[in-house]
Amino acid sequence: MKRMGMVIGIKPERIEEYKTTHAAVWPEVLAKISDCTIFLREPENLLFGYFEYHGQDWAADSAKMAADPKTQEWWAIHNPMQTPLASRNEGDWWAMAEEVFHTD
């Protein structure tokens, strides 16, 4: 298992809509993820996502998820609500964060 953190901006005028849609995530989207949490930081309007990856090949698994039509539909709704960080890696939407501490 690998812990993953990621950050993205959210447009302030879209925060309530983002919360509403995430209160009822589609089953087809939920079937592709587990152990996932998204936090909102205001007034900076940042989303911090945390999830646990349980696979062996992150690149292949994330490409498979990205190819899923329902996931693409979900992203098409939510991407306009978000503001990617300029410092993100090329090709990424969310900026991945480095884990610097963990304890059980």
Task: Give the ranges of each region predicted by the language model.
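Short amphipathic alpha-helical segments
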Residues: 14-35
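Eukaryote-biased recognition of C-terminal alpha-helical segments
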Residues: 92-101
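Short, glycine- and small/hydrophobic-rich beta-strand elements in well-ordered beta-sheets
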Residues: 30-48, 52-56
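A general secondary-structure signal for short beta-strands and their flanking turns/coil
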Residues: 1-3, 44
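An amphipathic, aromatic/His-enriched active-site/gating alpha helix that lines ligand/cofactor pockets
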Residues: 32, 54-93
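Basic/polar N-terminal segments that are highly enriched at the extreme N-terminus
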Residues: 1, 102-104
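Hydrophobic pocket/interface hotspot
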Residues: 6, 18, 22, 49
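Active-site-flanking beta-strand signature of metal-NTP-handling nucleotidyl enzymes
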Residues: 3-9
